[in-house]
Amino acid sequence: MIEFDNLTYLHGKPQGTGLLKANPEDFVVVEDLGFEPDGEGEHILVRILKNGCNTRFVADALAKFLKIHAREVSFAGQKDKHAVTEQWLCARVPGKEMPDLSAFQLEGCQVLEYARHKRKLRLGALKGNAFTLVLREVSNRDDVEQRLIDICVKGVPNYFGAQRFGIGGSNLQGALRWAQTNTPVRDRNKRSFWLSAARSALFNQIVAERLKKADVNQVVDGDALQLAGRGSWFVATTEELAELQHRVNDKELMITAALPGSGEWGTQRKALAFEQAAVAAETELQALLVREKVEAARRAMLLYPQQLSWNWWDDVTVEIRFWLPAGSFATSVVRELINTTGDYAHIAE
């Protein structure tokens, strides 16, 4: 299995280095749910600004403040502790008057707004995230500048970031041990993390192999293509390749790669043979996913950061802004720009 740092680059390995997350203010994330609170209902949506706090810690503190069980507070996604983040938490408080959440006090946190909502906020129920990153001590400005220009046109590999695999790859290692021993795993969180790491690693491997081809975005017979921004896909046939290639070039369609699991992967013929060959050596992880009935799915092979802009503060410091859809990783954008240094270079966003 290829480690994250050794995965194939779309724009070639960066020529320079830079410091990511010199301080939390250098990594700002604003969650975009894609909808507004209903204004009524048994739940309360709370938008919180956090600095130096992880999501679960804040959720538990909010539950304690509201005198409800911790399981009654949910969120759409985990956000990094070592960053400045805005995100929504959701508390189920039925049949009660609206509490004064401006009185909620927690070091590093500030309540920005809150309102009633009809439905629970579930994991993954967000549109995306807006990022503002500051890269410092950049050693090669010209290389980073050209890469930013190229990313606007060609995007980046839609890899799952190193954080998906746990500190030091612990989640992937856990999945491998589980696959090899067949010992039941009772802990629901471990099961979820390990299965997710296994499937993500196989996806990354398939994409890394595809990126070694001369024309990465060339549609081949049997490719599974996805309408940009949609979840469903269809299979490309030889007769349609020219027309479909035009739509891929226009970014109307996206070539996808497999998230292996039980059931059909989605590709056929030449494309399916390629994907199967790319992960042929990873029989244990594939068997684990089938055994645990993790359903196969698809994910876009490339990621196009939206609203991408940048501003050089000086020759060694650049501020970069962009928006990514839910499930995408900012660190997978950064790895195409610089070789990152710093204690938190691979920590989750």
From Swiss-Prot:
Q: Name one GO cellular component term.
A: cytosol
| Any one Pfam family match given in the protein's UniProt record, by short name | TruD
Keywords for this protein: Isomerase, tRNA processing
The positions flagged as active site in the entry are 80 (nucleophile)
Enzyme class, one word? isomerase
Q: Name one GO molecular function term.
A: RNA binding
The cross-references to CDD domains, in alphabetical order and at most eight, read: PseudoU_synth_EcTruD
Q: Does the keyword tRNA processing apply?
A: yes
Q: What does this protein do?
A: Responsible for synthesis of pseudouridine from uracil-13 in transfer RNAs.
UniProt similarity note:
Belongs to the pseudouridine synthase TruD family.
Q: What is this protein called?
A: tRNA pseudouridine synthase D
Q: Look up and give the organism this protein is from.
A: Shigella boydii serotype 4 (strain Sb227)
